[in-house]
Design a protein with these regions (language model features):
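Conserved P-loop/Walker A NTP-binding site and adjacent catalytic elements of P-loop NTPases
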Residues: 2, 8, 16-17, 22-128
Length: 128
């Protein structure tokens, strides 16, 4: 269950935008829940059959985001939500949301430019 955070108010409009236009830009203040609520709500809405990748600029932030989302589902990282950072990965065959760093995403694109199996990419902290 996702916590009751300010971003919850924007989720219906965000899901509608993603369903109708296939892309959206979301801006909200720090602590609103963008990082930990949006990917889970996208998954719940069934917006894609593929995995949801979320790009985090820092390794610590990537691990923390994945751990928080997994915890909110009552799971451990590597189940529904996982992460991949340099030197460490917690993903499994059932992972649907994967938090990655820039280096990991770059390698994924170099290996598979079409990102087969990926249905959505979220750029968190896009300003960085």
């Amino acid at each position: 269950m996702t916590p009751d955070l300010p971003i919850q108010e924007a989720i219906p409009a965000l899901i509608d935008a993603l369903q109708t236009r296939g892309r959206a830009v979301l801006q909200a203040p720090p602590g609103a829940g963008k990082t930990t609520v949006v990917p889970l709500e996208m998954l719940r809405a069934g917006l894609t059959e593929g995995r949801i990748l979320m790009l985090e600029p820092r390794r610590l932030a990537a691990r923390a985001a994945a751990e928080r989302m997994a915890q909110s589902l009552g799971e451990k990282p590597g189940e529904t939500v996982g992460y991949r950072v340099r030197g460490e990965a917690r993903v499994g065959p059932k992972t649907r949301i994967e938090v990655v760093t820039e280096g990991i995403l770059t390698r994924m694109i170099q290996t598979d430019p079409e990102l087969r199996g990926v249905g959505a990419v979220i750029f968190d902290e896009f300003h960085e």
